């Protein structure tokens, strides 16, 4: 069974979803891929997993590094799971490029190289935004591209984490936003 709750964050309303194992989704209302993978049958109810996720978000939006993860249970391919596991290793307030992420994944898998676009595709289909920190992945040279919650939110999330914002720029309309 899937359970849902809403969370009113400073950057907009968030839909949280969980099953008995862990958090399965966290989406900003109106985001690209909103509620992607959410079963048609779900119940709005408090669960220990959703309570932990809300506690994590409370700390995060208060400007603190939470220091723990709620139980996570993202559904995805083996490749997506590998990319999402790497996202969880990006430190609070730090960023990596899509190319760096692809190189890390290739190294872990014993491959000579990996496509940054392939890694970016998995990053873009992360169903547990913020907690699995896809907003910490940036384009080459600091280009802030590719956040399903919107570039404005990506900027605000990185600023909240006190990332060095002088290194980043928002590309012109029409370039991989």
Predicted region positions:
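Nucleic acid-binding interface residues in structured DNA/RNA-binding domains
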Residues: 5-10, 64-177
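DNA-contacting interfaces and partner/effector-binding or oligomerization modules
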Residues: 1-24
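Compact structured core domains
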Residues: 18-69
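A sequence-level detector of short linear motifs
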Residues: 15-16, 25, 97, 146
């Amino acid at each position: 069974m899937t359970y849902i709750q809403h969370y009113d964050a400073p950057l907009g309303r968030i839909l949280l979803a969980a099953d008995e194992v862990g958090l399965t989704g966290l989406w900003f209302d109106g985001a690209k891929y909103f509620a992607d993978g959410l079963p048609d049958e779900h119940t709005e109810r408090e669960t220990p997993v959703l309570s932990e996720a809300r506690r994590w978000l409370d700390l995060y939006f208060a400007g603190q590094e939470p220091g723990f993860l709620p139980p996570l249970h993202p559904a995805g391919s083996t490749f997506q799971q590998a990319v999402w596991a790497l996202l969880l290793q990006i430190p609070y307030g730090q960023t990596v490029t899509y190319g760096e992420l692809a190189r890390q994944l290739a190294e872990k898998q014993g491959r000579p190289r990996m496509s940054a676009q392939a890694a970016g595709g998995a990053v873009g289909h992360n169903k547990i935004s913020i907690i699995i920190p896809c907003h910490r992945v940036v384009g080459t040279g600091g280009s802030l591209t590719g956040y399903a919650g919107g570039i404005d939110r990506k900027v605000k999330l990185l600023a909240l984490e006190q990332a060095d914002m002088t290194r980043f720029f928002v590309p012109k309309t029409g370039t991989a936003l």
